[in-house]
């Protein structure tokens, strides 16, 4: 939130009153009015579009908007941030968002957010009040915004395309990934940081830039060479996925910084939750880019580490720490109390605050006043935050977030209208509809949900017979069921306790999500759908060419002779003499079942009845291993 008389980053004018967020109805919101991006046009072309095109058919049209749509009517300046940043919420007024059951213009998905408020797709339930509810919502936000496997796959393909161009120029060059993509703390629209190691007298920035244009890896207008920066880089946008990539040369600290972040993440388990929320908070306000004066990911991470190091709470390292309390106190520290003009941040040796006047005289690039001083723990003479000249605007945004969240978790918040359904975190963070659509497109292009899973039995063998045909097989076994009917009725009482502890063959159908946990006798691949487990007929199992019914007659004879003396306690004692079946592969039984007398094994039935199986010290195959022809005989 920018205060009166100040201008946000990017040169956009701000009137006297705060207008960081404007009503949804205003014409200033162009999120859903500009032409679709390249990935959106290819998605509408159909599923036949290649996920890795060698040459894109057309450039991104967002750079050539009509004048009526690309200009802010209030400020008269080009609304470029809407096109460059899908996550930008400039032009939205959170307090004026109304309940909606669908997509709000520029507000994001409402259907994913419990169908109540737009822009909060992580909100799938009602939370508790106060900081407890904020903690729960931060957890859900982290789960929703965490990288998906298909997003990682898509990014690796982008890296492969760029690496192939680099290898073509310099076969001995080494390309490595660092930054948020390396650590896993990246948002759906975060960029990819690459570093190229090689032997050059002069950095080949323009050589690589020309090669990237020639191979059409990047959009023609997106490739930029920042040769005057402290760390010269090449910035580009992938022509197909619109993923932004930064390429540097021979920078060792980038890879080392990724390892440092992983170490701190292990020490402070709360860090990933805080960092992801803070990155989204800055990203949607265009305060995350260093070359525009914002705070980069590495600086933001070090600020969070310093906050936890010097935090007065003793539970900062405990995994179940309340994330809501820590987030509010982070905003309070860096939004109100931290003195940016006189105080610097040091992470090394447990963390401390230092006087900027003393340490900046010994900096590598000489004495230069810096608005935000953060000492690099990997190179103490390096000021990580020296390029963040817009740190005061970030400070004001943090102060705004502290005020909003403090009121949202206060005791009087329960008297606010819609306090039970309104998102607390959504007061300062929103996910735009463009980001949600972009993630859906990635899931369709690189996800696994469109690949049909073949039906299988319990051993992971593909079924060539329809499940309904297998159900008919159950009707052909009525005679065999009647043959065992009497022994079931006579042994029903002693089996009630014995069956609860005995090993069971088929997987219980009552647990659809844990289809493999109930089968303790099988190491084979479990069936992925419980519906297919229901179709296995409860037939008498064969052992090689011998029928188990021979063993059944022997076991029933012994049971009838001792039935008058057996009690439930004796039935439980016989449990200790029984042996479990162990099978190391789907080829057949490989263990031995040894018992002093006929042991009665009971299996759970998926059709509501209990079926008993008897064996007497012989090797047998599990019923899942029976051939399909035997099941339907």
UniProtKB/Swiss-Prot annotation:
Catalytic activity, EC: 2.7.7.19, 2.7.7.-
Sequence ranges of Gly residues compositional bias: 103-115
Molecular function in Gene Ontology: ATP binding; DNA binding; DNA-directed DNA polymerase activity; guanylyltransferase activity; metal ion binding; poly(A) RNA polymerase activity
GO CC annotations, alphabetized: cytoplasm; nucleolus
Chain ranges for the short sequence motif Basic, involved in binding of the RNA primer as given in the UniProt record: 618-624
Region annotation (Disordered) ranges: 1-115, 484-633
The keyword Repressor is assigned to this record: no
Cross-link (Glycyl lysine isopeptide (Lys-Gly) (interchain with G-Cter in SUMO2)): 531, 558, 573, 587
S-S pairs: none
Localization (cell): Nucleus; Nucleus, Nucleolus; Cytoplasm
UniProt-listed GO biological process terms: carbohydrate homeostasis; cell division; histone mRNA catabolic process; miRNA catabolic process; mRNA 3'-end processing; negative regulation of nuclear-transcribed mRNA poly(A) tail shortening; poly(A)-dependent snoRNA 3'-end processing; positive regulation of 3'-UTR-mediated mRNA stabilization
Cofactor: Mg(2+); Mn(2+)
Modification Phosphoserine, positions: 545
Binding site for Mg(2+): 191, 193
Keywords noted in UniProt: ATP-binding, Cell cycle, Cell division, Cytoplasm, DNA-binding, DNA-directed DNA polymerase, Isopeptide bond, Magnesium, Manganese, Metal-binding, Mitosis, mRNA processing, Nucleotide-binding, Nucleotidyltransferase, Nucleus, Phosphoprotein, rRNA processing, Transferase, Ubl conjugation
Residues annotated to bind ATP: 254, 279, 297-298, 382, 386
InterPro entries tied to this protein: MTPAP-like_central, NT_sf, PAP_assoc, Trf4-like
Pfam families in the cross-refs: MTPAP-like_central, PAP_assoc
Biased composition (Low complexity): 36-52, 60-70, 492-519
Residue ranges of every copy of the PAP-associated domain listed in the record: 322-382
Keyword ATP-binding part of the UniProt annotation: yes
Record's catalysed reaction(s): RNA(n) + ATP = RNA(n)-3'-adenine ribonucleotide + diphosphate
Family the entry assigns: Belongs to the DNA polymerase type-B-like family.
Subunit structure: Component of a nucleolar TRAMP-like complex, an ATP-dependent exosome regulatory complex consisting of a helicase (MTREX), an oligadenylate polymerase (TENT4B or TENT4A), and a substrate specific RNA-binding factor (ZCCHC7 or ZCCHC8). Several TRAMP-like complexes exist with specific compositions and are associated with nuclear, or nucleolar RNA exosomes.
Main function: Terminal nucleotidyltransferase that catalyzes preferentially the transfer of ATP and GTP on RNA 3' poly(A) tail creating a heterogeneous 3' poly(A) tail leading to mRNAs stabilization by protecting mRNAs from active deadenylation. Also functions as a catalytic subunit of a TRAMP-like complex which has a poly(A) RNA polymerase activity and is involved in a post-transcriptional quality control mechanism. Polyadenylation with short oligo(A) tails is required for the degradative activity of the exosome on several of its nuclear RNA substrates.
Protein name stated in the entry: Terminal nucleotidyltransferase 4B
Taxonomic lineage of the native organism: Eukaryota, Metazoa, Chordata, Craniata, Vertebrata
């Amino acid at each position: 939130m920018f205060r009166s008389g100040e201008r946000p980053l990017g040169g956009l004018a701000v009137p006297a009153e705060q207008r960081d967020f404007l009503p949804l109805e205003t014409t200033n919101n162009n999120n859903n009015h500009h032409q679709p991006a390249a990935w959106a046009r290819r998605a509408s072309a159909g599923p036949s579009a290649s996920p890795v095109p060698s040459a894109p058919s057309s450039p991104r049209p967002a750079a050539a908007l009509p004048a009526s749509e690309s200009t802010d009517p209030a400020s008269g300046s080009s609304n470029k941030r809407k096109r460059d940043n899908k996550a930008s919420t400039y032009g939205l007024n959170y307090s004026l968002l109304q309940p909606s059951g669908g997509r709000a213009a520029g507000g994001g998905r409402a259907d994913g957010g419990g169908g109540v408020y737009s822009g909060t797709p992580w909100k799938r339930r009602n939370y508790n009040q106060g900081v407890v509810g904020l903690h729960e919502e931060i957890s859900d936000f982290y789960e929703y915004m965490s990288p998906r496997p298909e997003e990682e796959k898509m990014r690796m393909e982008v890296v492969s395309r760029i690496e192939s161009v680099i290898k073509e120029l310099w076969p001995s060059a080494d390309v490595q990934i660092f930054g948020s993509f390396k650590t896993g703390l990246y948002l759906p629209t975060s960029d990819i940081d690459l570093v190229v190691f090689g032997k050059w007298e002069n950095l080949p920035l323009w050589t690589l830039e020309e090669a990237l244009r020639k191979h059409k890896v990047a959009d023609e207008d997106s490739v930029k060479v920042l040769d005057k920066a402290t760390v010269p880089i090449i910035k580009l946008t992938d022509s197909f996925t619109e993923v932004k990539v930064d390429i540097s040369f021979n920078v060792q600290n980038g890879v080392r910084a990724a390892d440092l972040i992983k170490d701190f993440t292990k020490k402070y388990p709360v860090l990933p939750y805080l960092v992801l929320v803070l990155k989204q908070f800055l990203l949607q306000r265009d305060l995350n880019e260093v070359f525009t004066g914002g705070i980069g990911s590495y600086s933001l991470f070090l600020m969070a580490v310093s906050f936890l190091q010097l935090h007065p709470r003793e539970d900062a390292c405990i995994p179940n720490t309340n994330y809501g309390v820590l987030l509010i106190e982070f905003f309070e520290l860096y939004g109100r109390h931290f003195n940016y003009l006189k105080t610097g941040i040091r992470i090394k040796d447990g963390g401390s605050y230092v006087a900027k006047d003393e340490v900046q005289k010994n900096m590598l690039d000489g004495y230069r006043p810096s608005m935000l001083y953060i000492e690099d723990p990997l190179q103490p003479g390096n000021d990580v935050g020296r390029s963040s000249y817009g740190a005061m605007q970030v400070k004001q945004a943090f102060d705004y977030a502290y005020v909003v969240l403090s009121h949202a978790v206060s005791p009087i918040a329960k008297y606010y209208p819609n306090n039970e359904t309104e998102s607390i975190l959504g007061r300062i963070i929103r996910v735009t509809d463009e980001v949600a659509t972009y993630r859906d497109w990635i899931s369709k292009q690189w996800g696994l949900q469109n690949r049909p899973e073949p039906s299988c039995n319990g051993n992971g063998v593909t079924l060539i017979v329809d499940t309904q045909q297998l159900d008919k097989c159950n009707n052909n076994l009525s005679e065999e069921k009647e043959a065992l009917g009497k022994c079931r009725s006579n042994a029903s009482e002693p089996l009630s306790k014995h069956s609860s502890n005995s090993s069971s063959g088929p997987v219980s159908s009552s647990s659809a999500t844990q289809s493999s946990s109930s089968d303790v006798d099988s190491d084979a691949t479990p069936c992925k759908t419980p519906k297919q487990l229901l179709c296995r007929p409860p037939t008498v199992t064969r052992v090689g060419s011998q029928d188990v019914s021979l063993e059944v007659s022997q076991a029933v004879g012994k049971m009838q002779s001792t039935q008058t003396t057996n009690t439930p306690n004796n039935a439980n004692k016989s449990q200790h003499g029984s042996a479990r079946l162990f099978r190391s592969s789907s080829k057949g039984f490989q263990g031995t079942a040894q018992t002093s007398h006929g042991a009665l094994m009971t299996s759970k039935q998926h059709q509501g009845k209990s079926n008993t199986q008897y064996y007497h010290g012989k090797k047998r195959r599990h019923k899942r291993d029976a051939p399909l022809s035997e099941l339907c005989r």
